[in-house]
Each structure stands twice: as C-alpha cells, then as structure tokens.
Amino acid sequence: MRPKELIGSKSHEDHGLDSKVPLSFAEMIDLDSINDQDIKDLIIKERAIPVTISIDEGIRPKIIDSCGMTCSFCHNEGTPVASAYSKTTLLPNPRYRGGRVSIFEKTNNVNFIPGTMQPDDNFLDSLLQTKQALGIKEVHLTGGEPTLHPMLPQIVAMAARVDLDVKMTSNGENGKRQIAECASAGLSKINFSIFGTTPEELAMTQHERYQNPALAARKLDALHESINEALIHGLKVDANIVMSSLAHADRVARILDRYGEKVTIRIQNDLNNQRESRLAIYKFLAMVNAEPEELRIDAGTADAKVRYRMPTGEVIIFKQIRKTMLPETCGDCTLNNPTDCKEGYYGTRLYVDTNGKYKIGICLLRMDLTQDIDDFINSTLPGEILQHRERTKPTQTALP
C-alpha cells in the first residue's frame, strides 16, 4: 500500500472520499443507541483521530488449495475444495473429503477447480501482466495454507525479483520448516490467522470428525513455533482473530500476554453478528485502556483499520469494513444489498486452475465474474478498478 498522510479534520470532502461511505464503524454507530458510557467515550475519541489513506495496489494469489485445517467457516478464497473433486466431477457438487468446506461454493457459480501455482514463466507472466494492468505493487499469498507449498520460497523469490512486496496469510501449519528460507527470499510480513487460543477453542471450530483437543494442541504448537520463527527472522507479524462477542475477550488477552509488543493483534468483527461484535470489540478496547491513534483506509477497497495502543505499548488493530462498490460491476448486482453482500469490493485475487490457466477474480460471492487473465485484461474491469481507486483516493496529501 502507498500511504498518504492526512492530519486533522476527517470530513469526506477533505479526504476526497465517497461521501456516501462512512469512514469507519465509529461514524456508522448511533451514540444514542448505546448505554455503555465506556463504549461511547471510545467512539467519540475514534471519530477525532488522524487519518492515513493508502492506495490499494495489491493482489492475492491463491498459490495452493491444500490445508490441514477443517474450519467450518472457510470460504477457501471462493473456490471448491480441490481434493473433493475428480477430473470427471461437475461443479457444483461438493463432497468435502477430509472435512474441509467452501461455504460459498453452492451459490457463487464458481466453474473451475483450483490448481497449484509454480514458480515458472506462467506465474511470472501473470505477475507482470497484473503489474502493468493494475499497477500492482504487493502480492499477498493465500491458500489453502501457503506453508504447505513445497516451493514457497521460490514463489516468494520470483515475486520479490520483480519488485513486489511479498506478504502471506498463514495458520502456521508448516511455517517452522519454511519461514527462514522465505525470509531470505524476500517475504516481508505474515498475517497469522488464529481460530482459537486453547486446544478446546480451536477444536470447536473444526469439522466434527476432527474436534480433538489433542490434535488441536499440536496445531497450536505449530502456530506458536511459526510465529516465533517469523520473529527470529525479522518479519513483521500480525495475529488476526475474530471477536464475535465479549465472551471472546480472553482469547485476545492470551495473545497479548504471550507476545506483547512483538506481534500486532488485529481484531476483526464477525460479519454474521455485526452490531454485537463491534460493540464487544469497543468494550474490550476500553477494558484494556487502549487509546485510538490513527484510522487507515485503503482507497479502492472496503478495507479500513483503526490503530489502538495500550498504556504498556502494545498495538491492537481494529480491522473494519467500510463497504465500497465498483460502480458498474457492483451497481446492478442482485447481491448488492446489506443482507447478501457484507464486504463490498475487497480487491483482486489471482487463481490458477487444474489446467494451468491463470485467472483474476474480484468477488468471492460472484466467482462467475472470474476470468482468464487475458480476458480480464482485455475487459473493462481493469479500467473500472483503476477509476474506482482514483475516485476514492485523497485529493491532497495534507490538510491545513
């Protein structure tokens, strides 16, 4: 992301942003509807903090479909679980071998099986094409679980060689074996997804066949080993955790106690329980005496983050969704309503199918919009995305 500092007033007009879209959750919430004074006070403070605008210049390559987790809420980047299909299986026909799921597969009209990206000329060409068409400067590797890819360091190195900032989302499953070499190859940051902080918590998120605390304990050990390995090798580390209600406060506290200032905690609200989740996060932040410092918005996507700091120095990021839409593509979509589409346009994703064809997608709920990369580049979508980015970026870099 390319930051542009904006200090002072937070009006949409000053920032050159779409005035129909609230800057953050703090602007969406009616203070009169809140009875808790601690939450009210924190929201008022959040409304007054400085804003930093970053321009979305990233893409998310799904480099592998394999994963050793069986999370019941997994969207699998919009694609089917590859291991559930044979070459003769027609879509959609989920069989979920091994307990894995893809929660949108039955309804998103996906029409391909995900393959595995290789550090070859086809992968390099896809990066160069997206750089030219969309001005991409960052790749964020996803899966499945990226650390299960046997050639992950080579993929990182290839992206880094063409001047792309390389980041990754991981559950830490195989990180201890991969992270050192990835760091040497040019990886800059890992976002670790934390689905539970005790074996019992993690086990409850898995398919019923695998709700085994002993197995979950081994998964947690691997996660902690991966986080430590990333810190040893100088990588930036974020820990992502969803907080559905105040009952989950202990989970966040355990991560803070374990890693302190070494790791940035990113708390995400539950999209299926939005109001309770948001208020619970504000209450937790008030309970730990965290103070809001900065609102960061990624112009061109629905991503927004508020940085909080605790009195002891630890940073907590309240990750938020400020729902923005592509004007043409999203404008006439039947899912463009508060019930069906909770995120809006969240950026581009890069896929490869089992035939080795690279594709670009723009929506997990509308995988029918995913196109072969050449078709995408020759379509109107790159222009629409660039115009959307331009329309939502700031008109000035500093306020008087």
Label every model-predicted segment.
Residues 31-58, 304-327:
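Short, charged low-complexity linear segments at domain edges
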Residues 81-95, 111-125, 144-189, 194-200, ...:
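Canonical radical SAM enzyme core domain
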Residues 136, 163-164, 187, 232-236:
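A short helix->loop->beta-strand "cap" motif at the edges of active sites that frequently abuts
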Residues 195-331:
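Radical SAM enzyme [4Fe-4S]-AdoMet core and its adjacent flexible, acidic
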